[in-house]
Amino acid sequence: MKKMPMRKRFGQHFLHDSFVLQKIVSAIHPQKTDTLVEIGPGRGALTDYLLTECDNLALVEIDRDLVAFLQKKYNQQKNITIYQNDALQFDFSSAKTDKPLRVVGNLPYNISTPLLFHLFSQIHCIEDMHFMLQKEVVRRITAEVGSHDYGRLSVMAQYFCDNTYLFTVSPQAFTPPPRVESAIIRLIPRHNFTPVAKNLDQLSHVVKEAFSYRRKTVGNALKKLINPSQWPLLEINPQLRPQELTVEDFVKISNILN
């Protein structure tokens, strides 16, 4: 079967290292009864491993040439469904069976952040997620309060999920090699976060507004939203910088606006 060319506009870097692939599958630990969804399967390197472990696998691929390639490669497989679709627009609940989805993939680095936010909006139908991402993005997702990497993505990802940095992947594991290191992350949805955000759009707006002015105090950064008399009610020091606020702090700010 002929090789498929990479398309730069899709941010394609195909994983080929068998040791890394086995390590990823070990981290996912798929079960026969799982419903797995793989985003951006490429030529099917990870797919091949997953098919041996899982009886229900869905692939979401935007590249029509790769879709044709995958359809031909897996035309004898009965336990696989291929969707030609943009993952940023895909309704993940449409792939759901009687069990929550386990979502995996080597996410295109040029759309990884908006794709994560799209997945957060459908978190109710997801059991867990294992992704290959740019190492810098994984560091931001898992960043601690007060650190340089802590920001909007950290707050929103940590509101929706418990996140674990699993391991780093060298550029040499890909064809062509990306210019940056990659990392594998596990995200497990949190369905009982306390306090609960009353309005998720409001929470996202507050967090985005605050980190647009991360060098300012949070009192100044959010002065269009919060008046000075509200800070004592929130029990938050308005002289703190946005990166010094916890996820819980941002939820409290969001909730007082509703």
UniProtKB/Swiss-Prot annotation:
**Pfam families, per this entry?**
RrnaAD
* Gene Ontology molecular function: 16S rRNA (adenine(1518)-N(6)/adenine(1519)-N(6))-dimethyltransferase activity; RNA binding
The family database entries (SUPFAM superfamilies) matched by this protein are listed as:
S-adenosyl-L-methionine-dependent methyltransferases
Which annotated residues bind S-adenosyl-L-methionine? 13, 15, 40, 61, 86, 106
Keywords assigned by UniProt? Cytoplasm, Methyltransferase, RNA-binding, rRNA processing, S-adenosyl-L-methionine, Transferase
**Primary location:** cytoplasm
Which EC class does it fall in?
A: transferase
The reply on keyword Protease is no
Q: What is its EC number?
A: 2.1.1.182
Entry's Gene Ontology cellular component terms: cytosol
> Which family is annotated?
Belongs to the class I-like SAM-binding methyltransferase superfamily. rRNA adenine N(6)-methyltransferase family. RsmA subfamily.
Task: Identify this protein by name.
Answer: Ribosomal RNA small subunit methyltransferase A
The species this protein belongs to is: Coxiella burnetii (strain CbuK_Q154) (Coxiella burnetii (strain Q154))
- Gene behind the chain: rsmA
